[in-house]
């Protein structure tokens, strides 16, 4: 199920980050278990009830329910054509 976990992590990182998704770089901080519900970080997240209310309010105000989080800039994950950043 390693391929399935990698597939769900890749799919979920494209979309909105929710509490039950497992990201591969989380394994550095906590003990790396295959089940994300057993990890220490996940239990710390559920202790605070997931997304706090003011964060949800900021989310809906800034992007109106879009899937991109509001800490991304306008060109956060967008690719530019053949225009280079440094010349």
Swiss-Prot record:
User: Can you say where in the cell this protein is located?
Assistant: Nucleus
Tissue-specificity statement: In the embryo, expression is seen in the epidermis, somatic and visceral mesoderm, and the peripheral and central nervous system.
Record bears the keyword Transferase: no
Query: A single GO molecular function, which one?
Result: DNA binding
UniProt short sequence motif Antp-type hexapeptide, positions renumbered to this chain: 22-27
Q: Which family does it belong to?
A: Belongs to the Antp homeobox family.
UniProt name for this protein = Homeotic protein ultrabithorax
What is the organism of origin for this protein?
Answer: Drosophila virilis (Fruit fly)
């Amino acid at each position: 199920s390693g391929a399935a976990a990698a597939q769900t992590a890749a799919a979920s990182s494209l979309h909105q980050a929710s509490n039950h998704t497992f990201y591969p770089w989380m394994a550095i901080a906590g003990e790396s278990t295959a089940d994300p519900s057993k990890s220490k970080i996940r239990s710390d997240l559920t202790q605070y009830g997931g997304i706090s209310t003011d964060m949800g309010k900021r989310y809906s105000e800034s992007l109106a329910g879009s899937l991109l989080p509001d800490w991304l800039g306008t060109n956060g994950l967008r690719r530019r054509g053949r225009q280079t950043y440094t010349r």
